[in-house]
């Protein structure tokens, strides 16, 4: 996509119905999730991180309902810089009824492994990355989305044509 923000916006547009659905975020976290929720008229459910800036798995699972479509996990997290515990993430992917997005914009600064190698295990998992941070290439505006073939096919149907410029390609 034209930056990770476009990829995140496409996820809202594909999986959420405006003025009906909600998504879950874990503050403190990347502020663009809230901006995109507002732009797309999607309710934002905030479940704060707990001790050591980790997800409150029980609360997240408890708070989802039929209208909860996406869970955003920014790991490594912006602004706290920590990665979420892998077993907590795995539990959330398995117990969350919608799409789980792991935003790995800062993965190149982490000692933890990316979730890319586990995409085939979880059909509800989307991993996003960027070249803006570790590679210092923010100006080329390249956001990367990894997911099942089915999810990528749907996202490709609604993305604008020619959204990635020639230099970036």
Segments the model singles out, each with a brief description of its role:
Residues 27, 46-51, 104, 129:
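Short beta->alpha connector loops at strand-helix junctions that form conserved
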Residues 1-22, 40:
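Phosphate-binding glycine-rich loop
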Residues 124-169:
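PLP-dependent aminotransferase class I/II
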Residues 21, 69, 125:
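Conserved acidic residues
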Residues 44-48, 70-76, 100-103:
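Short beta-strands and strand-loop turn motifs
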Residues 38, 55-66, 79-134:
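Active-site pre-lysine segment of PLP-dependent enzymes
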């Amino acid at each position: 996509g034209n930056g990770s923000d476009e990829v995140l916006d496409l996820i809202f547009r594909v999986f959420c119905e405006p003025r009906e659905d909600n998504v879950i975020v874990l503050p403190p976290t990347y502020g663009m999730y809230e901006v995109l929720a507002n732009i797309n008229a999607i309710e934002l459910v905030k479940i704060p991180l707990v001790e050591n800036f980790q997800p409150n798995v029980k609360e997240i699972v408890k708070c989802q309902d039929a209208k909860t479509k996406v869970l955003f996990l920014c790991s490594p997290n912006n602004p706290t810089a920590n990665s979420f515990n892998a077993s907590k993430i795995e539990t959330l992917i398995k117990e969350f009824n919608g799409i789980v997005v792991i935003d790995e914009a800062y993965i190149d600064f982490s000692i933890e492994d990316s979730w890319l190698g586990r995409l085939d295990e979880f059909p509800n998992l989307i991993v996003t990355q960027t070249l803006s941070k570790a590679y210092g290439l923010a100006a080329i505006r390249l956001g990367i989305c990894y997911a099942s073939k089915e999810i990528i096919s749907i996202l490709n149907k609604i993305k604008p044509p020619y959204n990635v410029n020639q230099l970036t390609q």
